[in-house]
């Protein structure tokens, strides 16, 4: 494990973006794990800046959200699906049909979890 000490949130985003881009460099279909919350926002903001600058293209990428609330409508603005669409998919210009979020409103959550695991 490597510990990297950064001076501020912006530097955290830059360092993290550099690592992500090294991992996906040359991949025709990069696959990203997508978390919600405030921790990854600096990374997402820096990746969005680089997308806007033409330095990287995630339009063919695939995304998998880490989690979703149980029982929430996926169209609810507070759902993780909508959060991921707003904070990641739109700014990174990803195809929303290529981004998966666990189905927290499925009638059989165990089956939905297995299907999601298989998709990953």
Model-derived features with residue positions:
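Short, glycine/acidic-enriched capping/hinge loops at junctions between secondary-structure elements
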Residues: 16, 43-47, 74-76
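Ligand-binding beta-strand-loop-alpha-helix segment within the catalytic cores
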Residues: 56-120
